[in-house]
Amino acid sequence: MDPPCSLSASFEGSFAYLTVRDRLPQILTKVIDTVHRNKHKFFEDHGEEGVEAEKRALSFFSKLRNEMQTNKPVLPLTDNQLDTELWNQYLDYQKSLLNEGETPSWFKSPWLYVECYMYRRIQEGIVLSPPISKYDVFREGKIESFFQSQPAIIALCTYLQELKKNMAALSENQKQEELYKLLQVCLWGNKCDLSISGGLDNSQKFSILSSLESFRPFILVNDMESVLSVLLESKNPESGKELMKRVDIVLDNAGFELITDFVLADALLSFRLASEVHFHGKCMPWFVSDTTKHDFNWTIKQLQAANHKWMSKCGGNWKENLKKSHWIYHEHPFWTLPHEFCMMAQTAPDLYSELQKSDLVIFKGDLNYRKLTGDRKWDFTVPFSEALTTFHPAPLCSIRTLKADVQVGLKAGIGEQLFSTEPDWMISGKYGVVQLSTSV
């Protein structure tokens, strides 16, 4: 059976439509403001060339905003980067799905494609504006969000260090409860997404830990026990010895959410549920607040240098984990392509085979969920593993708060019931899932 159609802005009034009409131009306007505001910095760093580059970038972004708002055709990329050809091939693929004479455009093409395309065009605008071609237009917002989340970060680092101090005294049941708690922290940390707030302040200002009980009813799919079962399969039944166990985390947002991912990764090692954790980040600035290698390393450095005992202890431990290769950071251009994940084996076989080495792959956040499910109009009750179509590299778990109108694996009637009481339940970030597929 063919999968359902892709979500797109052609459905007037849909979240995709409102995103392309309002939110994406708003993000682009913020990019224009940021670049313009840094004009003096570009001059200090690069002289007149920096000022000329700023003008070029502004002109590029203004033109891009106009193309979007007037539903112009999607254009090929011209920046000769490693992924340029793949993007242009994907544009040809999108053309091949249309009738003769039709062209992919902002409001007609799949939402997943045009939203990813906007961020790749932002990168193109910077790349084509040397000498500022390495500039991250979203870095200021990510840094600000990190510092505004300090109270919540301190609370979480303190909690982790206390937990590790008392670990020997915990029963197996207590350890399980602690892991469930940290999975929930990881889930609700995903609320902090600057691409949804249009780049406006969306930091975590209070400790999530005290709210977990009250948040629990809002977890629509809760596969935490099954996730733990997958992790517990690490003991060899004959010898009782622990096997090497690898967990991968495909990251979403920098800032507070990244700290929740680090805390979970630390606990997995401390509980001996994993012997190594592999993190996957983006190779370019993406979706306003997504984690790049710079954000990853910068965050650990900030914690190391913090004037707070437990924050700096966490930073030191995490740096050590990287040094000893208990933690490994990867980046791959596939994560910033528009492709659904069911195309990974064909488009990026090296990445697919890397994920096949994992015992559990955790996908954080909404964009990953959209790519896992193809961002299609699935019925709410379709099983998660079915919506993944051919993407089954390893047991995988999606941890996301809902901020896009795609959701599968719900019990019959739940989606309809929520619509009748809360029309925006799929986009508010109020509800979440911890959803597992063990199909391999």
From Swiss-Prot:
GO molecular function annotation: fructose 6-phosphate aldolase activity; fructose-1-phosphatase activity; metal ion binding; phosphatase activity; protein carboxyl O-methyltransferase activity; protein-glutamate O-methyltransferase activity; S-adenosylmethionine-dependent methyltransferase activity
Cofactor(s) required, per the database record: Mn(2+); Ni(2+)
Pfam families: ARMT1-like_dom
Record keyword Flavoprotein present: no
Amino-acid positions noted as binding substrate in the UniProt annotation, renumbered to this chain: 252-253, 366-370, 403
Coiled coil regions in record: none
SUPFAM superfamilies: AF1104-like
Substrates-to-products reaction catalysed: beta-D-fructose 1-phosphate + H2O = D-fructose + phosphate; beta-D-fructose 6-phosphate = dihydroxyacetone + D-glyceraldehyde 3-phosphate; L-glutamyl-[protein] + S-adenosyl-L-methionine = [protein]-L-glutamate 5-O-methyl ester + S-adenosyl-L-homocysteine
Stored Gene3D superfamilies: 1.20.930.60, Uncharacterised protein PF01937, DUF89, domain 3 (3.40.50.10880)
Binding site for Mn(2+): 252-253, 290
Summary of the function given for this chain in its UniProt record: Metal-dependent phosphatase that shows phosphatase activity against several substrates, including fructose-1-phosphate and fructose-6-phosphate. Its preference for fructose-1-phosphate, a strong glycating agent that causes DNA damage rather than a canonical yeast metabolite, suggests a damage-control function in hexose phosphate metabolism. Has also been shown to have O-methyltransferase activity that methylates glutamate residues of target proteins to form gamma-glutamyl methyl ester residues. Possibly methylates PCNA, suggesting it is involved in the DNA damage response.
Family, per entry: Belongs to the damage-control phosphatase family. Sugar phosphate phosphatase III subfamily.
Protein name (database record): Damage-control phosphatase ARMT1
Organism whose genome encodes this protein: Xenopus laevis
Gene: armt1
